[in-house]
């Protein structure tokens, strides 16, 4: 019985952690990325624009992570969108959010 409750509590913890993680990605997007990606500033692919994201997504997640983390030469996209205080994990979570919205 004890192992049953441990399993239940672990599952609840994962659900809560996932919800918190998603909210954090959304908040990070709003505070650090939306200024360019909501309006398409300097040809930034807009959030949810499937046509704009399709060729980028074909390059794979690693390429998108690299662009977000290190910047993309020849574009306005600088490393971490200019927010050097963001952790790599935070940036990757926002990339994952943006990919999900473009599917």
What is each residue range found by the language model?
Residues 1-8:
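Bacterial N-terminal signal peptides that target proteins for export
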